[in-house]
């Protein structure tokens, strides 16, 4: 009997010890930051919150480290992005605030859900190359921020005028569509009403009359760009906003997940089975497995999150893109804020089934272009030719293996040299 009591006491002590978190010292956290950044450059601690410290290094790069040794050390990092900690980047601030809430709670020991190497690549490099934002030139066709009596000016490219910001939803849509370079033309029509003190103004877009100039959209607009390059991206952002029935005002541009889905399907010819799924329906392994599956297939993920301040009755929505992951299961996020604070983040720990905070999350699944063209029409010009062969070879040499359904000439679910030979054989046989 005494032995049994002794065993129970020992087990209870072991369980209690495993539940009690130790605290990482500043030196330990700095070492963890240097390891993940693969750098010995001096680190500046720019902020400390209960459970986590934020470090950045000169010349770019940052790491957010957990001080709770029940948690994996690295919560987020980037080897090149800047850490501004301003209020300007709403998506990053959502993640930071949600993570702070989690770290305030007593946590059981946890390990990050990593990609299963028998099913997924160890890591996926960021799929997006764009570092777009919501201000100039992206907003130069959005509604004016003050009333303009000449209604013909609305929806035109006017760099010298004041405009409402694009909004994170339309901007995320634009970056997502630019990845696929699809569509060339839109479908249908849509109108939205903008409210001013002087009266309402309704803006209208006929998407079928629009041509999206993908070749003139560049990755980075923070340097010099031509008028044509500015117009190309401004039109896309404006059309995304109207298609998603965005409400534009001094706070920016707001829309809903359902409207974004409907915009993709009804106006941009994306798969009509596309839908969004809330995280609350999934546990951590299932949620992360969905993410690894989509990314390893070459498809970025449009992600949605909300800050819900119940006492104040305020709901702030955010949209951004997850476009890669590392070997430790942290996902790469493009926040849509000019590349600022883009990096790898632990979103697995934001598990609404385990923690009691009011931050809603969802991701869009099945959101792919409806490519209704010939397999092999890689350049999307409506015919097959030697240009498609060279484009396909360039596509493969760039290290791509997915993300362009038309490049999958032999329809085997992957893109490889066999697609090149199949296309050449097809052309040599006299087919076009």
Question: What kind of feature is each model-predicted range?
Answer:
Residues 22-48, 63, 70-136, 142-143, ...:
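Cys-His-centered catalytic/binding microenvironment captured across papain-like cysteine peptidases
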